[in-house]
Amino acid sequence: EKIICGIQDLIGEKNRYREKMLTITPYAKTGMLHSMIAGNAAADNVGKFLDENYLDLIRPYFIVSVVNFAYDGTPAMREESHKREIEELFRTVTDIFSTDEVNIVYYFRDIYNVFLITNFETEQEMDDLFYQIHKYVSTAKSNSYVTMGVDIVRDDIGELKQACEGALKALDSILTEGRETVYFLEDTEDC
């Protein structure tokens, strides 16, 4: 809760949010965003973010999704190599699927879950993009079962925590529907 409040303080008012228009990409790629959300960032690092609005998104709309991996066998013995593979895969995913209109960043939670933030200018249907990402990741990681949970479109960075929770809630459909597909929060009954 403290971290989320800090993020909300970073962003400030919506008008100021739109005026500053800084990018989240360098911080997501270096793991700073993940560290803040997970509560692992040192106090002095968090202080740097309180200085200015470093976490503003480039465009007003965003969707958070989570990519979940289930492995055959136990990857723990090779956890470090899995981590490097997954991080390299998502660097490639962000390079391939980011365009002038859509910016995608990721943060690595662990070898089982990677969060993606898809940021875009106009509110639009993005389902096809998530299916394409799922197909690409599934093909690249053929030794695992890849499932995605996708939150709804949001336009307030103050809802970052809810967006992460929404993506995880969509992913809960694994329990009743199975793995190896994309689940959207808007399709769940009690969204």
Predicted regions and their residues:
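Conserved short hydrophobic interaction patches
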Residues: 96, 133-140, 170
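Catalytic core regions of nucleotide second-messenger enzymes
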Residues: 104-111, 135-148
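Short Trp-Ser/Thr-centered turn/loop motifs at beta-strand boundaries
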Residues: 150-152
